């Protein structure tokens, strides 16, 4: 089973990236092969242009990883109540999967993570990601993770999950991702 993570910010080791990596680590502990496309990787992607079929090596690598994934994790900051441009550009690139026998995220579980400075931005951004995943024929996991970065501190000084509720949600999401994969997926 392969689980691919997409997300983060331009800052390596951002909280959204670290939460995605925590979910991937929990999936790996359940036997999955995992791969993360973090913010610095996503920053190398040119702006998506559907009229240009040629892809850079970084673009082709992301598209192929998602094409062969059994499940996905997408993590975004909730900038002003929306998905970051960095993450949205990566999602838009997956339009290249439209002609596949299994287009887009067809039938695959997708875990969604949002970190935002407030509950409203986090909830709205999580809802937007759920809508995107539905439009791309995927199945958002029942547990979605919206973290209020003002009121919640997911990690301690050593970088370990420090919030019991967030840690439980990470484990629940990993279970839903790995158990939501169907044979032949």
Indicate residue ranges for each PLM-predicted region.
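Residue-identity detector for glutamine
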Residues: 120, 152, 176-179
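Short, glycine-/small-residue-rich phosphate/pyrophosphate-handling segment
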Residues: 106-148, 165
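N-terminal beta1-alpha1-beta2 submodule of the flavodoxin-like/Rossmannoid cofactor-binding fold
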Residues: 1-100, 158-185
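Mobile beta-alpha loop/short-helix "lid" or hinge segments that flank ligand
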Residues: 35-47, 103-104, 108, 136-157
């Amino acid at each position: 089973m392969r689980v691919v993570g997409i997300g983060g910010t331009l800052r390596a080791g951002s909280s959204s990236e670290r939460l995605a990596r925590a979910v991937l680590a929990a999936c790996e502990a359940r036997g999955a092969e995992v791969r993360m496309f973090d913010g610095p990787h996503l920053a190398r992607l040119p702006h998506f242009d559907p009229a240009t079929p040629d892809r850079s090596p970084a673009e082709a690598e992301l598209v192929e990883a998602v094409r062969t994934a059994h499940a996905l994790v997408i993590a975004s900051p909730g900038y002003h109540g929306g998905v970051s441009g960095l993450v949205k550009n990566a999602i838009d690139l997956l339009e290249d999967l439209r002609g596949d026998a299994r287009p887009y995220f067809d039938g695959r579980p997708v875990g969604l993570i949002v970190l935002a400075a407030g509950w409203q931005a986090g909830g709205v951004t999580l809802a937007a990601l759920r809508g995107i995943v539905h439009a791309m024929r995927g199945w958002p996991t029942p547990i979605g993770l919206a973290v209020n970065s003002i009121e919640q501190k997911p990690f301690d000084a050593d970088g370990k999950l420090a919030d019991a509720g967030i840690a439980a949600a990470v484990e629940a999401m990993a279970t839903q991702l790995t158990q939501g994969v169907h044979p032949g997926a």
